[in-house]
Curated annotation (Swiss-Prot):
Gene3D superfamilies: Ribosomal protein L25, beta domain, Ribosomal Protein L25, Chain P
Annotated InterPro entries: Rbsml_bL25/Gln-tRNA_synth_N, Ribosomal_bL25/Gln-tRNA_synth, Ribosomal_bL25_b-dom, Ribosomal_bL25_C, Ribosomal_bL25_long, Ribosomal_bL25_short, Ribosomal_L25_dom, Ribosomal_uL5_bac-type
Covalent S-S links between cysteines: none
Keywords: Ribonucleoprotein, Ribosomal protein, RNA-binding, rRNA-binding
A biological process term (GO) from this entry: translation
Family: Belongs to the bacterial ribosomal protein bL25 family. CTC subfamily.
Species of provenance: Neisseria meningitidis serogroup C / serotype 2a (strain ATCC 700532 / DSM 15464 / FAM18)
Subunit structure comment from the entry: Part of the 50S ribosomal subunit; part of the 5S rRNA/L5/L18/L25 subcomplex. Contacts the 5S rRNA. Binds to the 5S rRNA independently of L5 and L18.
The gene coding this protein: rplY
One Pfam family per UniProt: Ribosomal_L25p
Protein name stated in the entry: Large ribosomal subunit protein bL25
SUPFAM superfamilies, sorted: Ribosomal protein L25-like
Residues forming coiled coils: none
Length: 190
């Protein structure tokens, strides 16, 4: 899915200026990367808030329009208000199509309900890590990674090497020879 966000350069910075922006329905943010100086920006709160609720937005290549120029960016970080449903700040990183990006991608369990551990042994598959750090070109970043649990039995431990990575995507931990556990399979308690 492609996301497009309109942004404007913000001149005033600081706590007071940020509060004024939020009252006007804007989110203060920053755009950095691609060998340029960081730029203080403001984006529409409603657009970003509802986009952040979608899991794919966190790893998507976003078209950010700023001063009539469109840049390819990814969401690098964001802060939420402690108890209101409100985004306080967002960081975008500009990326180049030919340079790999390091990003965390969500992990999904698939086929667990068909596994022997769940069907016959009454067990469950539990994620130890909900995301995996990968390196890929911006166009190759997957929205999520699947962990196939069709063949698991109670007592199994699934590792990074059990995840089938799409072409052009590499696990940061596996590159460092760290085959971390990502899920466990437990049987029914007696």
């Amino acid at each position: 899915m492609t996301y497009e966000i309109q942004a404007s350069v913000r001149e005033a910075q600081g706590t007071g200026a940020s509060r004024r922006l939020r009252r006007e329905g804007q989110i203060p943010g920053i755009l950095y990367g691609e060998g340029q100086e960081p730029v203080a920006i403001a984006v529409d709160h409603k657009t970003v808030f509802y986009a952040l609720e979608k899991e794919s937005f966190h790893t998507a290549l976003i078209k950010l329009s700023l001063n009539g120029e469109t840049k390819d960016v990814i969401v690098r970080d964001f802060q939420m208000h402690p108890f209101r449903r409100e985004v306080q700040h967002i960081d975008f990183q500009a990326v180049k199509a030919d340079q790999p990006v390091r990003i965390r991608v969500p992990l999904h369990i698939v086929n667990a309900e068909n596994s022997q551990a769940v069907k016959l042994q009454g067990g469950r598959v539990s994620l130890l890590n909900t995301s995996v750090e990968v390196v890929a070109l911006p166009a190759n970043i997957p929205a999520f990674l699947d962990l196939d649990c069709a063949e698991v039995v109670a007592g199994d431990i699934l590792h990074l090497s059990d995840i089938k990575l799409p072409e052009g995507v590499e696990s940061v931990s596996l590159k460092r020879n760290e085959n971390l556990a990502v899920a466990t399979v437990t049987g029914k308690k007696r």
